[in-house]
């Protein structure tokens, strides 16, 4: 990696370590990665194990209204493919891939290039980081290495959020079952 890439990594890691919440860390990550890599989109999908879905939790470049609302089953789309394989998926024409899944809410149909990297912690997928470009291109090995390094840092942040019970991002009041309450004894 070049000195510039190392400086960028250091800056991102320092800001993430100084953040006060998982959501803030994810937003820092997508904004800095999009800027550093000069990509049109950077998104992070976190795995909701209970529902077997990847939920879009942060994005720079996709429709902001889709964040926190769009999800894919673990067997769906290119994000699901990255998670199933537990390895990088690098495509120069993503919409032509058999696993591409069009999600109109995100506006991602205009992006051709796709690089998805699994966020792994102790050999377990916790999410997927994705960068996309309108222009068709294969992302370089340096770009892959940059994202793998950032995903290693991100996995620790997510694992910490799990450990301290700060990852209840998947439980919204509408998703919780109705509990019956009883008055009295």
In which residue ranges do the predicted regions lie?
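Short hydrophobic/glycine-rich mini-motifs in sensory/regulatory modules
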Residues: 119-129
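Regulatory sensory and allosteric helical modules in signal-transduction proteins
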Residues: 55, 64-99
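Signal-transducing coupling segments at domain and membrane junctions
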Residues: 64-65, 92-113, 133
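Allosteric cytosolic regulatory segments
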Residues: 148-156
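A short, aliphatic-rich beta-strand micro-motif
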Residues: 112-120
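Signal-transmission linkers at sensory-effector interfaces
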Residues: 1-24, 35, 126, 160-185
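GAF sensory/regulatory domain recognition
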Residues: 31, 43-67
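Short beta-strand-to-loop transition segments that serve as allosteric relay/switch motifs
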Residues: 128-137
